[in-house]
A protein has these predicted regions:
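Canonical Radical SAM [4Fe-4S] cluster-binding loop centered on the CxxxCxxC motif
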Residues: 6-52, 280
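Short loop/turn motifs at secondary-structure junctions and domain boundaries
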Residues: 62-63, 258-262, 278
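Radical SAM enzyme [4Fe-4S]-AdoMet core and its adjacent flexible, acidic
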Residues: 124, 128-267, 272-273
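Short catalytic/ligand-binding loop motif for oxyanion handling, primarily in non-cytosolic enzymes
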Residues: 38-41, 80-82, 112-113, 163-165, ...
């Protein structure tokens, strides 16, 4: 990958809401911190207040001229969250369609019947595969059902160092059994916490695997897609502009944006305890708490990034530029 000049909107300015809806998960992966699954903040109470606060947030941005939104839900495991359906329905009521997007990061542990009933609520689905817990047959069954129905359907295989070959084999199974697929072979970050470093694989063959196997994809049958403008493009050194590939940015070590202008006011990260913060990196201020019904409409402008590296793929999508190209995103 070439060096990056800037990351820019696909079309018009848009707002990203990245929401870790709770900290409860039915999986207990050894590489995952207890803070992601223990259930200290399940957020299953006072759902109407949560929905009303989301509405307040969206109306604020709409008053500022924003029409397109992307809601990206993770956990924990968000498909088990009691507020999931009412939250997504309220979001869809206020976002502009076509053009906006609801995405979800799930472990595919819900049955096929659930996905048949609710898949219409989501444009993008990232299905993480966890070698210690995922049920391979069930995962494949759901993936095959969704393969021609989503704008974006990605199998994100978490490359556990002790189950590395199992992960490789499962990726091969998807490629053999599915007509359409996108597979990301994802290096595991130690404890999956923002402050930690990437996991360093001890065996050379595992390190070598990532050099040639970042992302693979195929489309053999038509996909029902609606236009989406809530995404980003990468502007490269040679002036080519391509859709952003967040996994490649990580695996090729391009996630270093210190000193760049970053429009963190166009991104909200909602933590499991309800805290609303501009971006997920910790640089932006806290602007409310969604489970307490609080939102401060006085948001900061873009910042010159002080961090050595950007740890969260969702933050890669925020408009950002090297100083000499900052005017392109103001």
């Amino acid at each position: 990958m070439q060096d990056i000049k800037a990351i820019i909107p696909a079309k018009d300015k848009w707002v990203s809401i990245v929401w870790q809806v709770n900290d409860w998960c039915n999986f207990r992966c050894t590489y995952c911190s207890e803070w992601n699954w223990a259930g200290r903040n399940r957020n299953d109470h006072d759902i109407p207040l949560i929905v009303d606060t989301l509405e307040k947030i969206m109306l604020h941005y709409k008053d500022k001229g924003y029409e397109y939104f992307k809601l990206y839900l993770s956990g924990g495991e968000p498909t088990f969250w009691k507020a999931l359906i009412p939250v997504v329905e309220k979001f869809r009521e206020h976002a502009k369609w076509p053009g906006s997007c609801v995405g979800i990061n799930t472990n595919f542990s819900k049955p096929l019947s659930w996905w048949k009933e609710n898949h219409h609520l989501f444009e993008d689905i990232v299905a993480s595969y966890h070698a210690e817990w995922s049920k391979d047959d069930k995962y494949i069954e759901v993936y095959k059902f969704l393969q021609d129905k989503k704008n974006y359907l990605c199998s994100r295989i978490m490359m556990h160092h002790d189950h590395f070959q199992q992960c490789v084999d499962f990726g091969n199974r998807i490629r053999e059994e599915c007509d359409n697929y996108m597979i990301e072979y994802a290096p595991v970050y130690d404890e999956l916490r923002p402050s930690t470093d990437p996991y360093h694989y001890n065996e050379q063959w595992q390190m070598d695997f990532f050099k040639t196997n970042s992302t693979v994809q195929q489309q053999s049958i038509p996909v029902q897609k609606d236009p989406s403008y809530a995404w980003a493009k990468t502007w490269f050194e040679d002036d080519t502009i391509e859709p952003i590939n967040t996994n490649s940015i990580i695996t090729e070590g391009k996630n270093f944006f210190q000193g760049w202008l970053c429009n963190i006011h166009e991104s909200l990260h909602i933590h499991p305890n309800g805290r609303i913060q501009q971006a997920s990196c910790g640089v932006g201020p806290i602007v409310g708490n969604i489970v307490q019904g609080e939102f401060n409409t006085t948001l900061s402008d873009g910042v010159w990034c002080p961090k050595s590296h950007c740890h969260c793929a969702a933050d890669f999508n925020i408009s950002k530029a090297r100083p000499e190209y900052a005017e392109k995103i103001r």
